[in-house]
């Protein structure tokens, strides 16, 4: 029996990254595709529960949710085993975090990007050798044209090698 807790286990993950700001900032800065000079320097934790505004919408809970002083929002999830619906759940959670920023009567330019970092202890893209998968909205023909808003990152732990 191991004398150490597995950091991938749900409660341990939430305890480590949900209560130690410097650790979650280090993780986010290391794994998110942040622009040069836009590293995260300060965060505040947000409630992990995202209650819908409409009565028949789904409640969702994430492992860690926080925002930085500049307004960017971050979601961190640890998923032990892959389910086909996980990508849709990630997209739903990120979209909810995005739209919840804008109360009625506020201007659209106030919306800040939402970054969702998802660490998966399973292989879900077996035909790809990369362990790091970054999704965001880009123009089909002109990939330098990006719609700011949702940034989804998935890390497949079984494919990761320290030399990667």
Identify the residue ranges that each predicted region occupies.
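Elongated, amphipathic alpha-helical interaction scaffolds
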Residues: 1-164
């Amino acid at each position: 029996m191991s004398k150490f807790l597995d950091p991938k286990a749900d409660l341990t993950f939430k305890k480590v990254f949900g209560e130690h700001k410097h650790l979650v900032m280090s993780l986010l800065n290391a794994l998110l595709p942040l622009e040069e000079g836009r590293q995260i320097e300060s965060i505040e934790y947000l409630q992990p529960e995202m209650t819908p505004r409409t009565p028949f919408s789904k409640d969702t809970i994430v492992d860690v949710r926080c925002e930085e002083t500049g307004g960017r929002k971050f979601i961190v999830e640890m998923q032990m085993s892959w389910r086909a619906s996980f990508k849709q759940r990630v997209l739903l959670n990120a979209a909810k975090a995005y739209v919840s920023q804008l109360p009625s009567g506020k201007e659209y330019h106030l919306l800040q990007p939402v970054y969702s970092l998802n660490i998966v202890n399973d292989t879900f893209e077996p035909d790809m050798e990369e362990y790091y998968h970054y999704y965001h909205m880009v123009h089909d023909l002109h990939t330098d044209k990006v719609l700011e808003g949702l940034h989804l990152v998935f890390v497949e732990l079984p494919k990761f090698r320290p030399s990667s």
